[in-house]
């Protein structure tokens, strides 16, 4: 810290004074004053980080504990991109006396992989921006004073692994009704596994469409504020993916596990699933006991319009007749009414459209009935709006192409973000190959294990450190703190 203090005294104070003098002369230049101070404070922060890292490395070099197992091999510079900017510092390569393998011990203590160039805080900022805008913007926002390439952002996102929802409330919640809304977005692929692998059909159209799935669980709807006409979901939780086959079934199992771990399901009167009746949704519904499918209003009205659009001024009356038949009559009576409406067509034009609508409503007959009967607890669905907000805004509203891996990871990242997930915790969740020196053996540790180990060690050493913290200098306290990490080498 001594060098940082000298830097502050010799460089920063004079620059601060110059900035203040300029501001006093031109009081309307407050923005420039703030910008100037911000830049200087950034530089000071980077100097402090650099000095702290080099102090740690020097303590490793001087440590008698380190000397028992490791010898100094070489010194080299390293650049790290932090959320504050790039830090260039010197570090030491050590060689193990037991194994003959070389390693930068400071990297191990910091939890940084051998080829890692971006710190956790910078990566968290990168993900927080990329999930909302683009890979390019994610790279630009990684650091205040530098940036990384869009390819780096893409690689980081493609490598992401997401934690399962294992956090359980202390007490399960009791509610009368639960709602599951499900829908999908269609995105364009650049390729599936590798470039050039998209096939064409007989009409020379590329098979480049991929379904991204959205499911969200909530307890109902309420007004955003007492006087607002806008509604919002109560306690929503989002799930996204591009799962197919067996993966789709596991996707729905994860949703049910969330319900089971957060709610007293035996106290719930009904669980309603609002959807368009897609096959991937119906296969999931079959895996969950006690749920009732409700056809969402958007798709029901869409197909009623297909059945009645040719009726012109009588369109509303015809649509209401169809609703009445669906609500309280039989499939046979519905088909008779559709046949009657087809009789008003001019020639064969429109037959295909009406037959498609007839088949759709018949395939979702019970779900359509439930929607129109408005049974206890049935509420309006918002699937189309949520698909636009959750998936389309980032993945399909602007011209862009994806790979299957990229689409899967971004969909999951969108869900994590909307569930208020902490990006720093997500970065730390990723597995890192960090060797643990113990008799020359190396184990792969996850960041979760590392954090747990650090917590245990703090509990063991904390009482001792606290007992002497009032009687030793600041510099010596740092030595005590850091030596606790060297003892593990």
PLM features per residue range, with description:
Residues 1-51, 94-489:
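Catalytic center-proximal scaffold of phosphoryl-transfer enzymes
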Residues 70, 75-78, 82-112:
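Cys/His-rich short segments
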């Amino acid at each position: 810290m001594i060098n940082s203090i000298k830097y502050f005294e010799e460089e920063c104070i004079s620059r601060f004074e110059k900035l203040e003098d300029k501001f006093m002369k031109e009081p309307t230049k407050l923005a420039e004053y703030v910008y100037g101070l911000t830049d200087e404070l950034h530089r000071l922060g980077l100097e402090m980080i650099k000095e702290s890292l080099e102090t740690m490395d020097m303590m490793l070099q001087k440590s008698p504990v380190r000397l028992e197992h490791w010898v100094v091999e070489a010194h080299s510079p390293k650049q790290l991109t932090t959320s504050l900017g790039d830090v260039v510092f010197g570090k030491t390569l050590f060689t193990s006396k037991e194994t003959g393998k070389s390693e930068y011990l400071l990297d191990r203590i910091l939890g940084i992989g051998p080829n890692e160039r971006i710190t956790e805080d910078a990566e968290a900022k990168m993900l927080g921006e990329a999930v909302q805008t683009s890979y390019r913007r994610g790279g630009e926002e990684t650091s205040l004073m530098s940036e990384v390439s869009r390819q780096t952002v893409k690689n980081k996102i493609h490598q992401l692994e997401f934690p399962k929802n294992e956090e359980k409330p202390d007490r399960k919640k009791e509610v009368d009704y639960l709602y599951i809304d499900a829908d999908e977005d269609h995105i364009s692929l650049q390729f599936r596994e590798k470039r050039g692998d998209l096939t064409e059909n007989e009409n020379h159209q590329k098979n480049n469409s991929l379904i991204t799935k959205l499911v969200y669980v909530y307890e109902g709807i309420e007004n955003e504020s007492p006087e607002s006409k806008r509604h919002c979901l109560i306690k929503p939780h989002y799930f996204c993916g591009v799962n197919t086959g067996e993966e789709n079934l596991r996707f729905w199992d994860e949703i049910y596990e969330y319900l089971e771990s957060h709610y007293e399901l035996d106290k719930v009167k009904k669980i309603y699933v609002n959807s368009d009746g897609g096959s991937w949704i119906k296969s999931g519904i079959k895996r969950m006991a006690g749920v009732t499918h409700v056809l969402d209003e958007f798709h029901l009205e869409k197909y009623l319009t297909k059945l009645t659009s040719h009726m012109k001024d009588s369109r509303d009356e015809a649509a209401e007749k169809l609703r009445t038949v669906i609500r309280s009559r039989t499939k046979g009576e519905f088909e008779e009414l559709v046949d009657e409406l087809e009789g008003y067509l001019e020639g064969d034009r429109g037959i295909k459209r009406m037959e498609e609508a007839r088949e759709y409503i018949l395939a979702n007959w019970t779900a359509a009935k439930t929607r129109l009967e408005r049974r206890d607890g049935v509420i309006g669905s918002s699937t189309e709006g949520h698909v636009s907000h959750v998936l389309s805004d980032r993945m399909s509203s602007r011209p862009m192409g994806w790979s299957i891996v990229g689409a899967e990871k971004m969909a999951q990242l969108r869900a994590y973000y909307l569930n208020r997930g902490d990006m720093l915790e997500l970065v730390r969740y990723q597995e890192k190959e960090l060797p643990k020196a113990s008799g020359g053996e190396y184990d792969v540790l996850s960041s979760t294990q590392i954090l747990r180990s650090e917590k245990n060690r703090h509990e063991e050493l904390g009482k001792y450190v606290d007992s002497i913290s009032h009687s030793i200098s600041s510099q010596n306290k740092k030595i005590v703190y850091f030596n606790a990490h060297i003892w593990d080498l």
